[in-house]
Amino acid sequence: MTKDYQDFQHLDNDNDHHQLRRGPPPTPRLLQRLCSGSRLLLLSSSLSILLLVVVCVITSQNSQLREDLLALRQNFSNLTVSTEDQVKALSTQGSSVGRKMKLVESKLEKQQKDLTEDHSSLLLHVKQLVSDVRSLSCQMAAFRGNGSERTCCPINWVEYEGSCYWFSSSVRPWTEADKYCQLENAHLVVVTSRDEQNFLQRHMGPLNTWIGLTDQNGPWKWVDGTDYETGFQNWRPEQPDNWYGHGLGGGEDCAHFTTDGRWNDDVCRRPYRWVCETKLDKAN
């Protein structure tokens, strides 16, 4: 009996020792903490997974956005190239159209100029025709009156203030031009007023033209005897100068109209146009 009691006591001691080794049983608060930690771990894992999913989605969308951006850049580049090509083509077409317009404008201007010249020429022909008809009528009247009185200029001569003028279309030296006028019962033109000067300029144009003024025999004289010193003069500045530097020998002894209408002395051998003049009552 005592042995059994000792064995039982020993067994109880072993159980107590085993319990001491294992520690005290877990309390409810500890279990709650363990459960709470598991939940936190699970929540953290879930959040990590969710975050990973979000990152994957964002990465996928970012990749798609990059592809879209590259596509947009390519489309923009293609559009830019296409636009530049179209602009160049339009510029080329515009330049071509501009050249064609300038060509058309040039042609129109030339045609207008030709028409103006033709119109002016036609008017001159009409005026000349009227003058010729008038001269012919005048000559017929003079013929019927046995030529006792002249009331108009010969054909191709121009009447002005009681004188008749003939304008050459060829050129001759001063002496030959003067002889030609004498054969027409006239003389080289003698300019006696500003009005006559203007009349002559309108008919001559801007051409060098001999007039009946010379100093070959001394002082300047008009061929018809008109007084030079007290009469009308229209020399260019510093003229006459009797210049010897022309290399043609001698000085300058004959006067002529210059291109602006003023007078200049020159070598008489130069070939210029000329104007003949005669009084209306002396015209043939």
UniProtKB/Swiss-Prot annotation:
Lipid group attachment sites (S-palmitoyl cysteine): C35
Transmembrane region(s): 40-60
Residues the entry annotates as binding Ca(2+) 1: V190, E196, E277
Alphabetical GO biological process terms: endocytosis
MF term (GO), any: identical protein binding
SUPFAM superfamilies noted in UniProt: C-type lectin-like
CDD domains: CLECT_DC-SIGN_like
Motif mapping: Endocytosis signal: 5-8
Coiled coil (UniProt feature): 59-117
Keyword Glycoprotein on entry: yes
Biased composition (Basic and acidic residues): 1-18
Binding annotation for Ca(2+) 2: D215, E252, D253
Short name of one Pfam family: Lectin_C
Residues annotated as binding Ca(2+) 3: Q239, D241, E252, N264, D265
Tissues expressed in: Expressed exclusively in hepatic parenchymal cells.
Note: Calcium is required for ligand binding.
Function description: Mediates the endocytosis of plasma glycoproteins to which the terminal sialic acid residue on their complex carbohydrate moieties has been removed. The receptor recognizes terminal galactose and N-acetylgalactosamine units. After ligand binding to the receptor, the resulting complex is internalized and transported to a sorting organelle, where receptor and ligand are disassociated. The receptor then returns to the cell membrane surface.
Name this polypeptide is given: Asialoglycoprotein receptor 1
UniProt source species: Mus musculus
Phylogenetic placement of the source organism: Eukaryota, Metazoa, Chordata, Craniata, Vertebrata
